[in-house]
Amino acid sequence: MFSLQEICRKNIYLLPDWLGEHVVQRLGLYWKKHGTLQRIGDDYVLIQQDLIIPINEALRMAGEEGNDEVIELLLLWEGNIYYAIIGALEGDHDSLAYKLYSQIRDCHNILPLIQDPKIFEKCHDLDESCNISCLVLNAVKHDMLCILQEYKMLLSGGDIQEVFETACRSQKYDIVTWMGQNIAIYNPGVIFDIAFDKMNVSLLSIGYTLLFEHHINNMIENNMDTNSLLMQHLEWAASTGFLHFMLETLKYGGDVTIIELSAAVKYDHRKVLDYFLRRKKLPRETLEKLLLLAICEACSKKTLNLLLSYLNYSVDNIRKKILQYVKQYETTLIIKILWKKRKINLIDPILADFVGYHSYTYLINFMREFSIYPERIIKMAARVAREDLVIKFSKKVCKDPIDRLNYLKTLVYTMRHKAGKRVLIYTIHNLYKASYLESKEMFKLARFYARHDATFQFISICHDLSKLNIDIKNLLSECLEIAIKNNYPQLIKAIKMDMNYE
């Protein structure tokens, strides 16, 4: 055929009325017994100016009739060759089917388009490299149970297992049920694994039906009894949050215990927890264990609130445990919830521990989260000799060194812990050494040291004043009175020695 005719055949969408039947036939736009063929858009054809059908349906019809020329034309119009092959198989035009198949060399993409089991099998036979097992596997995927029934005796044990698993994964429930009831399967219990993997409760139900109603005992491995299997399934379902799986399993036995509830807590499945906590009257000790587990696993605020609500937010029995777990797992959400809901204060005891070993950055965030004043943390830091925290937090409060020094002095006045007070004074003195104070301020600081029995720091600042040739006799006399009044023997001795040198 000339290339011009080929171009015309491919691109003519509207035949002129004046074209006679002979010309149309010569152009190859005529379908014997049907009439003229005309392309309509990209997906349809018009037959004899009367009937519009999809191109692929026309291809199937042409294949069934064995009409090579029309098939060639429709393929030129971008029809799908798969339908021509199906039609050729339906019309028993095997040579035409093989001829068309030679252009694609893979039958498996055609199979989903076939409804008739006989044509399905004939199509699969076009691929000479495929075997019976491949045919049955594809039949299962496409709901052709009759093919499985026909060839079941030709399948090996391994093939049967593969077919059964394929049916399960493809969710072909009728085939799964039929195989479970009629064919010896090496490991039918795999249906449960696939049910959980696919989150498919229908497969789970079929598995239980086969186990309990048809008594297929090899569904359970490792000599496990049925109750143990059900409890295992309940724990799996709880850990994955599949409440509907748990309810399906409970139809056949088993019970929800602390093991299953713990699995739900561990993986933060609040829906499962809420359902069973509402329906089971659990002992308080069990609820407390679940709450402690939730703290360990850093569960969400909603899960913690749910468990606390069943305890009526009363945690007196496990207060020490909560503090231990908060410290161990570095989670403070439970403390925040208890404070907001019931004003239960666990902040103070845990803060004392946190100040002992946590970083400045962590404590800054903790301080913001619980609205804690910096001086509270500074005093706690002083008690445990965390001078680094004292310096950083005081610097956060007062940027100016002199202001910072005065700020720390005010904290010393309210500090009762002796060792903590010494840490603050030590920090103040280091800050003084790194700053420049006028003599008037130095006198004030010396009196401050005297009032708090800071002998070493008092001697140090007096020596600094002496180096500046500042008369400190009156200062020494005043501070001696303070030392005598408060009975500070070391300070008294040090002042008297200084007075002898002045």
Swiss-Prot record:
Entry's induction text: Expressed in the early phase of the viral replicative cycle.
Q: Which Pfam families match?
A: DUF249
Summarizing the function annotation, the protein's role is: Plays a role in virus cell tropism, and may be required for efficient virus replication in macrophages.
| Transmembrane domains' residue ranges | none
Lineage runs: Viruses, Varidnaviria, Bamfordvirae, Nucleocytoviricota, Pokkesviricetes
Family per similarity comment: Belongs to the asfivirus MGF 505 family.
Q: Does the keyword Nucleotide-binding apply?
A: no
Task: Give the keywords, sorted.
Answer: Early protein
User: What name appears for this protein in its UniProt entry?
Assistant: Protein MGF 505-5R
What is the species listed in this Swiss-Prot or TrEMBL entry?
African swine fever virus (isolate Pig/Kenya/KEN-50/1950)
